[in-house]
Amino acid sequence: MKILVTGAKGFVGRNLCSQLNNIKTGKAKCYGDLQIDEVFEYDLDSTMEQLDAWCSECDFVFNLAGVNRPQNPEEFMTGNFGFASTLLDTLKKHGNKAPVMLSSSAQASLTGRFGNSEYGRSKKAGEDLFLQYGEENGVKVLVYRFPNLYGKWCRPNYNSAIATFCNNIANELPITVNDPKVELEVLYIDDLVEEMIAALKGQEHHCEFEGLTVLPSAEGRYCYCPVTHKATLGEIVDLLHQFHDMPKTLMIPEIPADSFAKRLYSTYLSYLPKDKAIFDLKMNCDDRGSFTELVHTLNCGQVSINISKPGITKGQHWHHTKWEQFIVVSGHGLIQQRKEGTDEDVRDFCRNKISRYKIPKYIFFVDEFPMTGSGKIQKFRLKDLGLKLCKEQGIEII
């Protein structure tokens, strides 16, 4: 299958082309038997000769090209309607009946605050043109009205509030929120890309629109992405400030699986400058060794690193309503538990395997763990180095 993507260097186009090329090269293996042979990437630096050639060969078209922030309103119609006409005329010239997807906007509803939107009018004109083209030529046309988009590679200070907030907060720049109670419906770029690939496989989601409201319908003229989220500006900014403060608080906010918070955190990280990808941790040192907190959580306690010098015994205490788990990753020593109130029931644990020790209401002792290094402990936003340490020390992993 050969795919033509117009607007390939824009926010949506770049993300879509990246995944399409992953499928083409076999890096993305989660789409069944979908096979992509070529991805034609058309943008402002492409030629009309290239467009003509690609329109003659392609098996599917993603039309993402458009104008969002022109210098004058007339450019909306030229950029959004004019190019659409050129694209469809070129496909028609070659008799190419490949399915065509159109990227439109919620503003094309021309309702509510979008009633006088020049951008919305140009998008609505493009929709009508595509739908008419489909009816007249027997071509499958997929018109998507996207809400507010966000995700990696989205340009800040352009047309995405989330991109601007992420960029400014990550880079210590001020932000402006006129009304924190304003609610946005937002669509994450990876969810959009998944829907585009579903459309490529003939599994798109159809609907009708009642104003801005999506009405799912198998026979609907329009299409939509089924996974969106709603959040107020205040909620978005509050989450971003929590992400920003993590190096100081070490507190990981609640990030449920498949949540808006998870998507927003991934987006925020993509705007971090290089010098913030790593940060120092506070290393509490004394004659016994050191203790360093790594992360705190709201519901699951904290994670820390404890380094003991040779011959040192730590512990010798117990908790009423707290439990601890120890994972020994380097060195050697003896961990013991004794049942409170008796000298009996002393438990020894294996010394030469990577193990996890659960500590209930027992006194525990930790002996003979040597120092593994010196200087500041730093936390990386990378995978854990434990496996590397194991291999270097010849420690068996169980």
Annotated model-derived regions:
Residues 1-26:
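N-terminal Rossmann NAD(P)H-binding glycine-rich loop of SDR-like oxidoreductase domains
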Residues 43-86, 90-94, 107-114:
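NAD(P)H-binding glycine-rich loop region in Rossmannoid oxidoreductase-like domains
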Residues 85-127, 134-137, 141-142:
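Conserved Rossmann-fold NAD(P)-dependent oxidoreductase catalytic core, especially the SDR/UDP-sugar
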Residues 128-153, 173-182, 217:
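Conserved beta-loop-beta element that borders a ligand/cofactor-binding pocket
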Residues 147, 164-187, 207, 216-225:
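A conserved pocket-lining segment of Rossmann-fold NAD(P)-dependent short-chain dehydrogenase/reductase
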Residues 198-283:
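Mid/C-terminal beta-alpha module of Rossmann-like enzyme folds, strongest
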Residues 346-398:
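Conserved C-terminal "lid"/linker of ANL adenylate-forming enzymes
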